[in-house]
Amino acid sequence: MEVKNCCMVTEFILLGIPHTEGLEMTLFVLFLPFYACTLLGNVSILVAVMSSARLHTPMYFFLGNLSVFDMGFSSVTCPKMLLYLMGLSRLISYKDCVCQLFFFHFLGSIECFLFTVMAYDRFTAICYPLRYTVIMNPRICVALAVGTWLLGCIHSSILTSLTFTLPYCGPNEVDHFFCDIPALLPLACADTSLAQRVSFTNVGLISLVCFLLILLSYTRITISILSIRTTEGRRRAFSTCSAHLIAILCAYGPIITVYLQPTPNPMLGTVVQILMNLVGPMLNPLIYTLRNKEVKTALKTILHRTGHVPES
């Protein structure tokens, strides 16, 4: 397809959430507490994991990584969205748009990889308890964590480079509340079929491989739990995995809805991505703290030390 002979775009206009004209301040008041709770909840988990010696285990090491991810993931899109909901500028520079897309997919793919690693950690702990500390030693844990970040960087670099090597020389109105591939590609003044195919394949392949590995881990875990003779033993083993399973279900629904539909629905995609960017990162701390006695105990200890909660 021939590139149009026009001036190159230097900035984009984010049109925001469709069909919400006149509701900006209402949405701001609604979304701001979600974002604040996301930051507060994940900081709390991170502080609990770092300050409690009992939580210096592989499981909580990866949970701490997930908390860092959740804070970063929300912060990629939410501050700009909240600013224009307040009535400030909807403009975003070309470079900022590139950065927003890169970090959105960088941190988004890390979630898939990290959930896969966390499933493997639970599989090792339940299926090979006597060898757990040997298999999941500190060096392996660090290597797995670094690996998730490196793979996320590679994945995001591919998608970002394919999206922004295309020329943008026509309309600059992004029909979305942040810079993402489905909203940007229609603005390109060149053939986008390669970028569409690669992004669909890349996201689909990563999601499928991670999901299958998680499914394999939890199939083995379920078999092992059912073989435990005592009811209390089965209950304790299941309680360590149930929070992780809930978080996985919350993560994979939006991925399928937004990126893996043959004919995406823009309105549905926007609603789902708001839930993914705001609600998902806020729910993870709640899921893990409400169902985990060790995290709750660590948080209570911190509050006791700071004098916010009296000793019982």
UniProtKB/Swiss-Prot annotation:
Entry keyword Hydrolase: no
GO biological process, one term: detection of chemical stimulus involved in sensory perception of smell
Extracellular compartment spans: 1-26, 79-97, 161-197, 261-266
Cystines in this chain: C97-C179
Segments on the Cytoplasmic side according to the record's topology features: 48-57, 119-139, 219-239, 288-312
UniProt membrane topology term: Multi-pass membrane protein
Gene Ontology, cellular component aspect: plasma membrane
UniProt keyword annotations, A-Z: Cell membrane, Disulfide bond, G-protein coupled receptor, Membrane, Olfaction, Receptor, Sensory transduction, Transducer, Transmembrane, Transmembrane helix
Database matches in InterPro entries: GPCR_Rhodpsn (IPR000276), GPCR_Rhodpsn_7TM (IPR017452), Olfact_rcpt (IPR000725)
TM region positions: 27-47, 58-78, 98-118, 140-160, 198-218, 240-260, 267-287
Protein family membership: Belongs to the G-protein coupled receptor 1 family.
Physiological role: Odorant receptor.
Record-given protein name: Olfactory receptor 10D3
Organism annotation: Homo sapiens
